[in-house]
Amino acid sequence: MEFSRETRRLALQKMQERDLDLLIIGGGITGAGVALQAAASGLDTGLIEMQDFAQGTSSRSTKLVHGGLRYLKQFDVEVVSDTVSERAVVQQIAPHIPKPDPMLLPVYDEPGSTFSMFRLKVAMDLYDLLAGVSNMPAANKVLTKEEVLKREPDLKQEGLLGGGVYLDFRNNDARLVIENIKRANRDGALIASHVKAEDFLLDDNSKIIGVKARDLLSDQEIIIKAKLVINTTGPWSDEIRQFSHKGQPIHQMRPTKGVHLVVDRQKLPVSQPVYVDTGLNDGRMVFVLPREEKTYFGTTDTDYTGDLEHPQVTQEDVDYLLGVVNNRFPNANVTIDDIESSWAGLRPLLSGNSASDYNGGNSGKVSDDSFDHLVDTVKAYINHEDSREAVEKAIKQVETSTSEKELDPSAVSRGSSFDRDENGLFTLAGGKITDYRKMAEGALTGIIQILKEEFGKSFKLINSKTYPVSGGEINPANVDSEIEAYAQLGTLSGLSMDDARYLANLYGSNAPKVFALTRQLTAAEGLSLAETLSLHYAMDYEMALKPTDYFLRRTNHLLFMRDSLDALIDPVIKEMAKHFEWSDQERVAQEDDLRRVIADNDLSALKGQQEG
């Protein structure tokens, strides 16, 4: 179904003509998940996003559907259980997006190590138990020092004790958002990007009955009426709530900044994802991850109070991450000049909650007796000598023996909250990208109840555990063969097998729609046929309105294909200008915007300071 600039125009027109059941403010993963479930459940749904979809937090993650093994250091079992359960659901409803990737976790004999070899084995066994992983090759494996170095010979050898391998999943975060958005659009939701909420419409009792917004592309004010409004703006949640609390600061959110850096794979060669202690005795771990022909690593985790729209990578961030990777990979000698791209994102953490974080510091202490008892019980369970109930009981004993420490940025809860203010505004905040579906389900359960109680409207919530996102109509047990079948179809449209396979992996069950565009398109000047199809599909079916939307979020060109990016800039802008009938002034403005984003990602300013 078309999802284009014209779709946007019609959506804004219809939003101003209706009294929606639900208006969603925010088009990141949380808002996208709410929109999908609301529209599929029959609610008259609208969604506005002030930037591009996923432009804020949801395209700036570590790009994993992460199981959270790190939580098991302190036996935050409930968190890991929820996370791996939801990860399995995401695999079911978006099978073309998460891809299994065994993660290597080296263990070093040094102060502040997250795991000893023994604790790592216990944690991995518990992790597999919670994830339902029981058979090879997915099951975890303990490695000797020699086996770790055989896998990753460039790792630091000094102090290396061994390691482990466990199952994790890589993710395309921005694609997960847009596929949820597209499905919501197909089910009737009215959706528009680049529309900013500016204030609430209130009735005589100071209850919200809609939103005053501004179309940032035309600078026109828009009035949208809705029975209920939900705030899913992540780091901006407090700002939206502030509309009706003027003069009364709201501090529910405590954003932290996470930075990732990208270098060429030859500069930092890793054959598989690596998750390793920083070696700085700061209680933190970093990921070093291969993607395309690049390697990226991160993340930092620091409190943030700056510009929410444009968080920047600082010299301090770069120094920290380069220090870590050069310590763990001593022969790499990565410098700032090797950095090809980067991103800084804000985590929408909630204030006032303490828990351990998969990248974070130790937030609690487990007594030796509780730990030993849990270890013995898990071992007995694995040997079929004890029950799952016994494991659960031992886990509860560990949880009750845990004492909290003072919060640091990495120990703030990744938990979510769903609140309703006195004026009727719902706010769904916090959480991890893996939890988005469950968060939306909880919110919609409450919203549907309120619609019945306050407005006499009844809806049945869709079973979102089995409701695929756009592109996700693939058998989860047969993903590789179905993707390959789509790729074969692409070759019949004149694509090379490599290009067809790339597009099939990117678009899943929507790949035939992409290939069908060859009936009306030929390769644009300066672009391959595959690139031309991808660009036009993004413009007509994914509401890509700007070059940055295409290069950074509909594809990963700007992050992981930096070598070929420069050659694509002019042809893509030319094709978009032709498609959207841009004036010369608009075309120049779009190119300037793209080059500014590229300069930010390339760290041009920091590199220039060093040269100066």
Curated annotation (Swiss-Prot):
Taxonomy, superkingdom: Bacteria
Localization in the cell: Cytoplasm
Enzyme class: oxidoreductase
Region (Disordered): 398-418
RNA-binding found in the keyword field: no
Annotated binding of FAD, by residue: 21-49
Keywords: Cytoplasm, FAD, Flavoprotein, Glycerol metabolism, Oxidoreductase
Comp. bias (Basic and acidic residues): 398-408
GO annotation, cellular component aspect: cytoplasm
E.C. no: 1.1.3.21
Catalysis performed (reactions): sn-glycerol 3-phosphate + O2 = dihydroxyacetone phosphate + H2O2
InterPro entries in alphabetical order: DAO_C, DAO_C_sf, FAD-dep_OxRdtase, FAD/NAD-bd_sf, G3P_DH_FAD-dep
GO molecular function: glycerol-3-phosphate dehydrogenase (quinone) activity; glycerol-3-phosphate oxidase activity
GO biological process, one term: glycerol metabolic process
Cofactor: FAD
Family: Belongs to the FAD-dependent glycerol-3-phosphate dehydrogenase family.
PANTHER family listed in its UniProt record: ANAEROBIC GLYCEROL-3-PHOSPHATE DEHYDROGENASE SUBUNIT A, GLYCEROL-3-PHOSPHATE DEHYDROGENASE
Descriptive protein name: Alpha-glycerophosphate oxidase
Protein's organism: Streptococcus pyogenes serotype M18 (strain MGAS8232)
Upper classification of the organism: Bacteria, Bacillati, Bacillota, Bacilli, Lactobacillales
